[in-house]
Amino acid sequence: RLSLTPWPSKKKVRVDLTVYANYAGAYTPTRPLFNVVVSTVDPSSLEPDFLETIFHEGSHLLFRYEGKWRESIFQTFEAGSYQMKFPRHLWHVSLFYLCGQVCKEEFAQIGIKEYEMVLLTRNIFKSYQSDELFAVLNQYMQNGHTLSATTEQLLGVLESKTNN
C-alpha cells in the first residue's frame, strides 16, 4: 500500500541465505532478476531487525526503478526549482523508514515495545535523517498526504537542511 505499486502476481522472489552478503549483511539486485541475499551470520540475524531486513529487501521490488515512489521524487524535483543536488538516496531512506516503522508497529502488537528501526540503529543515510523528514513520512503512512504532496514536502525538508 505505501509504495503504491502492487506486488507482481506472477513474480517469484528468490531469497538466498548465505554466510556473507556484503558489508550491510543483505542486498537485493533487481536487474536482470529480483533476488534477495541475506547473511545468516550477521549479528542482526539473531534479532528482530532480521525480519525488518527481509521486509526491506523484499520491498525493493515495490520501490524499484520506474516505480511510483522513485518517479514521484524525480518528476517533482525536475518540475521544481530546488537549490540543491538531486537527492538520489531519498527513495531509499524513505524505504528504510517506512519498512522500519511498519515493523515497529507490528512488533509492538506482539509485545516488543522497545524496537528501534535499522535506519536509526545503524545510522543509515544519517545526512537525510531529521525529525521533520520522519514527520512527513509518518503523515504519509497515516494517509495524511498523497504521494505527490509527500514528495514535495520531503524535498522541501531536504532543501531547507541544505540551505541552513
Predicted stretch roles:
Residues I112-N164:
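Pan-zinc metallopeptidase signature
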Residues L33-L46, R70-F86:
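Short helix/strand-bridging catalytic loops that position acidic/His residues to coordinate divalent metals
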